[in-house]
Design a protein with these regions (language model features):
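Electrostatic, structured charged patches in enzyme active sites and in nucleic-acid/phosphate-binding
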Residues: 1-135
């Protein structure tokens, strides 16, 4: 969150708690069942038109829900175009032996189009390596 607080347009952030009545939820499908995902952070930024909300989901690469959550985030972004600034899955990625923090912004159509058809963590990892924004 330190990085998010540095830009001059930063306004506030919220730790989105799991399973609270007020929690923000993005649905995703896991094993054929609709499952709720509670993205970790919501960041508010000032804009000329008021406040823009960003959804940030730091996610380890060693969990079985990686690609289903990424697809769920991409579907959510497609269903809510323009409602959020960024809708990002973030993780540590190793490229050529160097680890870097990278993000896939599902609010970007080009990223979303690559993520929507995936069905494996290997495919998601390749997209992080090729298209992930270095943070």
């Amino acid at each position: 969150m330190e990085r998010e607080q540095k830009p001059p347009d930063f306004y506030a952030w919220l730790r989105n708690a799991d399973r609270k009545p007020w929690s923000f939820v993005i649905p995703y499908e896991m094993g054929g069942e609709a499952t709720p995902m509670y993205p970790d952070f919501i960041v508010a930024r000032k804009s000329n038109n008021g406040i823009v909300l960003d959804i940030l989901e730091p996610h380890r690469d060693d969990t079985t829900d990686n690609w289903p959550k990424a697809v769920g985030m991409a579907k959510y972004a497609a269903a809510h175009p323009g409602d959020f600034g960024r809708i990002m899955m973030i993780r540590m990625v190793s490229v050529a032996g160097t680890k870097t923090l990278r993000a896939l912004d599902m609010a970007k159509l080009a990223v979303r189009n690559k993520v929507l058809p995936i069905t494996t963590d290997v495919q998601l990892g390749a997209i992080f390596a090729s298209d992930g924004e270095v943070l």
